[in-house]
Amino acid sequence: MLQNPPTHVRSILILQTKFIGDLVLASALARNLRLQYPKARIVFLCEANFASFLLAHGIASDVVAFRRVRMRGTPVQRGRELYAMVRALRRLRFDLTIDLADSKTSRIVVRLVNAKTRVGYDPPEKPLRWMECQPANVLTKPFGFGGQHYLYRYLSPLEALGVGLRAPVPTIEPLPLETARALALLDRHHLRRNAFIAVHAGASFRGRQWQPERFALAIDEISRQTGLDFLLVGGPDERASAERIVAKAASPVVNVVGALSLATLLAVLGQARLFLGNESGPMHMAAAAGTPVVGLFGLTDPAVWGPVGVASVTPRPSMPCECIARDLCRRPDPSKACCVWRLEVKAVVDAVLAILSRKVKDVEHAL
């Protein structure tokens, strides 16, 4: 840990090779670095699908992108992608690298880029393998500033660098053009701003997706009690779940799953009265846009991965979980467990009504 922040920092590389939710949380790190080093160029290493979002919203000054499908391909494909990635990074000559990815590949990249100041975790999330070394020369704690939420893992490098925490939660302002597009979309579907609930039924693993039939039942009950409208959002690979919800729900549900860019999705979420959905990237996007959240959790601990900075409720089935999907569930890995399937419709409806009535004792406005 440094006593004083490094000086003369002109170029910073943040390695965040995970998914959109992680990038949203990491945007708070970038914001604090921008406040400390207003003239520095902040570059993200990230998956190509997220590059335009980071650039458009000012989270990154520049992006070096990679294709995840190639990094998971043949050894030749991985080698070529890694070579192109490192070659592009070395041209930029960084003063500071921050390895949020904390992986074998990211440590190779940090070593090859070889910035003067290199921040990495001690201990790493997974133990180093034989013959693997930590290239960082500034070691940061797994969680910084006394926090337990994963956000504080991404903020921890600030503490190691001696940089103060001035922006404690992610906030991402939708772009004016995207807000105009969002309002036009709402108008086309006869939805009023702040009078609809954005619903996201997808997640990266099927076991983390609450059943579409239960979403439909919850939508019908919430509609009956509140009169609010519903808008289904999500990516192209989540269309099947959305169609099942539309088919099962008695209430009208507008379905735009697969039709929005990330930038437009952020703007749409910013117009919603509430976000209702699984633990996922769009949940963190909604919170960053300032929209209250009801996030549905299973084995994953909401205290570690829940929404931050907004009013929120995170209903969860009782634990320990009596497994109901032994053929699919891969406990104890929370990212591959099916515990959310045990979550009852009433608990979700009650959580939504509590947020809407602001009678939530444990509403989290900021960490």
Predicted regions and their residues:
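Catalytic machinery of carbohydrate-active enzymes
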Residues: 1-367
